[in-house]
Structures are given as structure tokens and as C-alpha cells.
Design a protein with these regions (language model features):
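Glycine/threonine-rich flexible loop motifs
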Residues: 149-153
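Short alpha-helical segments enriched in small residues
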Residues: 157-158
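Short gly/pro/ser/thr-enriched loop/turn and capping motifs at secondary-structure boundaries
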Residues: 146-147, 201
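Glycine-rich beta-strand-to-loop/alpha-helix junction loops that act as flexible
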Residues: 141, 174-179, 195-199
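Conserved N-terminal beta1-alpha1 strand-loop-helix module at the mouth
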Residues: 1-94, 110-136, 163, 170-171, ...
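Non-cysteine beta-strand/loop elements that form the S-adenosyl-L-methionine
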Residues: 97-98, 137-144
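Gly/Pro- and small hydrophobic-enriched strand-loop and loop-to-helix capping segments
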Residues: 94-103
Length: 215
């Protein structure tokens, strides 16, 4: 079951997001996830993307299962980014897809009544089109600020978040892209926030999460 409260602070990560760490990035991801869950993140989205990500499907599945176990232990929703079939196989709580991934209608057909669906939107037009899709639980809006994880994407700014919010789209919104402890407060009135580097690169991860939750 989807509860919009889970969007308050979503941690998004995969092994590639620890590129700055020497050593075993998989263990560092799992350690960081457990610390983040103890620090009260409200959901975790498993995202393996890019050249530094795991490429072997068996390894990806194994790591996803480890992350899922931790989420179950702490009672936080476990969401898989893009990998719809993996999300179904593992019985994840949700799946998050982008505009360039599998067609949203196909995702709905596969996932309806089995797991909740989040959809990325980068324009007001995409958000208006998605508002009639009952099976889509929430919309991810971004990148709000410049971010290394989405170098190829045009920054949409807080303005787009405000436009979607004011347009009458009733679906819960979650902002993503370049969000830090210093700019998160600008976004709270529109919905939740999703972060990668604000946690993965924080020197004091627990403090970063506590600060983000208060924003």
C-alpha cells in the first residue's frame, strides 16, 4: 500500500554512488543504507545506473535483496528504479520509472495492484498527462538543481515544481536532483524530497539526514 508520507525523505542509491570510496562499494552502500534507515529516512530507492554501476544481473539482484532485507527490518518502503521485472520478482513495495524507460501504460499493466508506481516528469505537459493515470502513485520532478547523477538532463528548477503544484495535479510530488541541506527548505511546501549525494557524500550522514528531515 502506498502512503504519501514515505516521500518525506527518500534515499536513492546504488553502488555507483560511492565512487569516491576506495574499497568495497557494495558493503559501503549496505552500511550507509542501514545507518540511513536508523536515522529515519522514509523510503529507499535502489538505483543501479551508469558506467560504475553493477552490470551483472545476478549481482544486481543479490544486492537488491540485501537492500530489501534492511528496508523490511526497519519498516521502510523498498522501491526499485527502472527494473520493472526485478521489482516484480522481488515483490518490492514500489517501482520508479522515467520517461525514457518502459512505456508507463505497460508498467501499469504489469504492476497494477502488485506494487505502487512512481513516474519521473521533466515538464508540466508530462505531469498533466500523468495525472489521469490512477495507477501512478506519485510524480518525481527534476532535476531541480544541477546534479552529477543526471548530467544529461536539463535542470528544471523550483519553478517547474511550483507550476505542477499550482496546476491542479493532485498526485503527491517528490523533488529530486542536486538537493542539499542548504536548499531543501525551498522545496518542502510542494511535497517530498529525494537525495543521493546529500547522504552518500556527507561526512556525518546521521546529521545530514536529521537536518534534511527538519527542513
Amino acid at each position: 500500500m502506498f502512503d504519501a508520507d514515505c516521500l518525506k525523505l527518500m534515499f536513492v542509491a546504488g553502488s555507483q554512488d560511492f565512487y569516491h570510496i576506495k574499497g568495497d562499494r557494495i558493503n559501503v552502500l549496505l552500511e550507509t543504507l542501514e545507518l540511513a534507515l536508523q536515522s529515519q529516512i522514509t523510503a529507499f530507492q535502489f538505483r543501479q545506473k551508469g558506467d560504475l554501476a553493477l552490470q551483472d544481473p545476478t549481482q544486481i539482484k543479490r544486492l537488491a535483496l540485501e537492500c530489501q532485507k534492511l528496508c523490511k527490518k526497519y519498516g521502510a518502503p523498498f522501491i526499485i528504479n527502472d527494473e520493472v521485472r526485478l521489482a516484480l520478482e522481488l515483490k518490492a513495495d514500489g517501482v520508479h520509472v522515467g520517461q525514457e524507460d518502459m512505456a508507463i501504460e505497460e508498467v501499469v499493466t504489469l504492476c497494477q495492484k502488485r506494487l505502487f508506481i512512481g513516474l519521473s516528469v521533466n515538464t508540466l505537459e508530462q505531469a498533466l498527462k500523468a495525472r489521469h493515470l490512477d495507477a501512478v502513485a506519485y510524480l518525481g520532478v527534476g532535476p531541480i538543481f544541477p546534479t552529477p547523477s543526471k548530467k544529461d538532463k536539463q535542470v528544471v528548477g523550483v519553478e517547474l515544481l511550483k507550476k505542477i503544484h499550482d496546476s491542479g495535479v493532485k498526485k503527491p510530488l517528490i523533488a529530486i536532483g542536486g538537493i542539499t541541506m542548504h536548499n531543501a527548505s525551498k522545496l518542502r511546501e510542494y511535497g517530498g524530497i529525494a537525495v543521493i549525494s546529500a547522504i552518500t557524500q556527507a561526512k556525518d550522514k546521521a546529521l545530514a539526514i536529521e537536518t534534511l528531515l527538519k527542513k
